């Protein structure tokens, strides 16, 4: 199985399976001299951690990350700092319940990677999905914490859930402070309360639903990215598409641009006191694959969780028709915990872009 590494100069390789003894990552290309401890990474992992509300999987994992290499401390440093060597990260799995999957070991869950993994590799770890499980994203979040350190305090990466099922937020009520006040990372308190009832009904029905996550990055200077095949927006889109269950990505106005007229979609410019000023941001902070200095705006759609208790038709490994219902502990809406993962993927792309920009910029 190849392609477990993400990035160019700032690279992250993840390893491990949902029900294995541990999961981990190796971060390569991190500059030396950056202060780094586990406490810098843990807050981001706590946001993604399972078992935090009744609206996510009840699997109880503390997700305590350990830094095994790549940092050093002595009397000349103010705490551990990165050395430039690969940084190894590890999280132990402590609450596996593999017996929950014995009934589906030879059946393919509709909408899941079971079928394609079997067809490609001839073998799959059916316990929680193995490598295809969203459990792997914990290591992306940990690595994303390191990427944020590389980016520095001048760049802010925030994300929110803006739609669950067919119920979207009211953008006139958007409040970033509200995101940390509810279990959905929702910027609209009124809609978050409605989602509570929606999710309770879904859980009782044994079903699931999809969602849309919006990521907003502030502070990226003009000039990051490259034309043609290394466009900043194409790399952000590709990064979001690597997240489990993501089926669509848009930048700025995205698909809504198709309904606009040219004079409306183009972001007009004026000269301000400190330089050029854009009058709108329909292009999501990127033109020609290069950042404009405006906010980067990315949205991605997450399909409903495939593991549900509703009985469905499928095939087994002998290509015999059968029915399946998936027991175990699953997210009724995987989009909720995808919010911190979306932030992490944006951080990984931008840390890589920062290092690449340093070698290509005219300024």
From Swiss-Prot:
Record-level GO cellular component terms: cytosol
GO biological process annotation, one example: amino acid biosynthetic process
Pathway where this protein functions: Metabolic intermediate biosynthesis; chorismate biosynthesis; chorismate from D-erythrose 4-phosphate and phosphoenolpyruvate: step 7/7
Pfam assignment, any one: Chorismate_synt
Binding site for NADP(+): 48, 54
Subunit-level organization: Homotetramer.
Organism: Maricaulis maris (strain MCS10) (Caulobacter maris)
Molecular function via GO: chorismate synthase activity; FMN binding
Record EC number: 4.2.3.5
UniProt: FMN binding residues: 131-133, 244-245, 288, 303-307, 329
Assigned keywords, A-Z: Amino-acid biosynthesis, Aromatic amino acid biosynthesis, FAD, Flavoprotein, FMN, Lyase, NADP
Cofactor detail note: Reduced FMN (FMNH(2)).
Chemical reaction(s) catalysed: 5-O-(1-carboxyvinyl)-3-phosphoshikimate = chorismate + phosphate
Name of the protein described by the UniProt record: Chorismate synthase
Annotated family: Belongs to the chorismate synthase family.
Job description of the protein: This reaction introduces a second double bond into the aromatic ring system.
Cofactor(s), by name: FMNH2
């Amino acid at each position: 199985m190849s392609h477990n590494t993400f990035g160019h100069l700032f690279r992250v390789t993840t390893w491990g399976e949902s029900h294995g003894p541990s999961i981990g990552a190796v971060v390569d290309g991190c500059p030396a001299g950056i202060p780094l401890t586990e406490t810098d990474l843990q807050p981001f992992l706590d946001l993604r951690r399972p078992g935090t509300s009744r609206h996510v999987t009840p699997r109880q994992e503390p997700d305590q990350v350990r830094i095994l290499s790549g940092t050093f401390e002595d009397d000349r440093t103010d705490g551990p700092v990165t050395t430039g060597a690969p940084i190894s990260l590890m999280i132990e799995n402590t609450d596996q319940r593999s017996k929950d999957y014995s009934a589906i070991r030879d059946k393919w869950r509709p909408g899941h990677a079971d079928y394609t993994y079997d067809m490609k590799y001839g073998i799959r770890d059916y316990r929680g999905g193995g490598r295809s499980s969203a459990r792997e994203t914990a290591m992306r979040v940990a690595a994303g914490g390191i990427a944020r350190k590389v980016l520095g305090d001048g760049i802010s990466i925030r994300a929110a859930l803006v739609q669950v099922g067919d119920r979207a937020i009211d953008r006139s009520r958007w409040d970033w402070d509200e995101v940390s006040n509810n279990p959905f990372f929702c910027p609209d308190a009124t809609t978050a309360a409605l989602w509570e009832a929606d999710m309770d009904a879904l859980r009782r029905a044994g079903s699931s639903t999809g969602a849309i996550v919006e990521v907003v990055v502030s502070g990226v200077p003009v000039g990051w990215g490259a034309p043609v095949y290394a466009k900043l927006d194409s790399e952000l889109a590709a990064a979001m598409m690597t997240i489990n269950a993501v089926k669509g990505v848009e930048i700025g106005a995205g698909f809504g641009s198709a309904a606009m007229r040219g004079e409306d979609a183009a972001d007009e410019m004026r000269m301000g006191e400190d330089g050029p000023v854009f009058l709108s941001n329909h292009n999501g902070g990127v033109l020609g694959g290069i950042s404009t200095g405006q906010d980067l705006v990315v949205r991605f759609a997450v399909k409903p969780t495939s593991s549900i208790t509703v009985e469905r038709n499928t095939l087994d490994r002998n290509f015999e028709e059968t029915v399946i219902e998936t027991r175990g502990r699953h997210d009724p809406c995987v989009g909720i915990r995808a919010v911190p993962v979306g932030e992490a993927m944006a951080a990984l792309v931008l840390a890589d872009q920062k290092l690449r920009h340093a070698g290509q910029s005219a300024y």
